[in-house]
């Protein structure tokens, strides 16, 4: 089901049939360095299950992104609730296959998600939680109108 459309992308809800394509994304060490390493098959399934739960409970989550005119899943972008400063906040997250890095897909998707968060979901503020070493993602966030509000440590895998 299509959620958002941009000039070059379609963002849609993920389905179980996307498992192999999601594996190509989440099992790439270079793509997943900000998450402290690539996922194994079970971790990919757990990640998918979390998205399905988010769709049901929140009405949104991380969506699959594909180029218009192609069925290939090139990344994911969307809105999830994350814990920050003792509260639950909406976060815009994005992750794309490395062959699609530095081509403007992340900012295109992130801007669409920001607009959706404000105008469709009615949020008054959104966040992007980004690893301090992920300079490219920080640049995307700044181009998306984000401002740094805090620095903190978040562990994804106990590292």
Cite the ranges covered by each PLM segment:
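Sparse recognition of residues in long alpha-helices and their boundaries
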Residues: 38-39, 60, 87, 157
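Acyl-donor (CoA/ACP) binding surface of acyl/acetyltransferases
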Residues: 1-33, 66-159
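Secondary-structure boundary/capping residues
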Residues: 31, 40, 57-60, 126
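Conserved GNAT-fold acetyl-CoA-binding loop/helix
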Residues: 30-50
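A short helix-loop-beta-strand connector motif used in the catalytic cores of GNAT acetyltransferases and
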Residues: 51-64
């Amino acid at each position: 089901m299509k959620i958002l459309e941009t000039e070059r992308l379609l963002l849609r809800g993920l389905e179980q049939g996307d498992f192999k394509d999601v594996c190509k994304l989440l099992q790439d060490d270079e793509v997943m360095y900000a998450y402290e390493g690539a996922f194994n098959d079970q971790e990919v399934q757990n990640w998918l299950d979390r998205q399905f739960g988010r769709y049901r409970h929140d009405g949104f989550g991380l969506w699959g992104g594909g180029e218009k005119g192609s069925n290939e899943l090139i990344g994911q972008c969307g809105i999830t609730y994350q814990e920050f400063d003792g509260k639950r906040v909406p976060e815009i997250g994005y992750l794309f296959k490395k062959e699609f890095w530095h081509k403007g897909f992340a900012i295109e998707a992130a801007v669409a998600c920001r607009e959706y968060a404000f105008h469709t979901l009615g949020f008054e503020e959104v966040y992007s939680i980004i690893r301090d070493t992920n300079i490219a993602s920080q640049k995307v966030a700044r181009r998306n109108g984000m401002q740094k509000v805090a620095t903190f440590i978040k562990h994804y895998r106990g590292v």
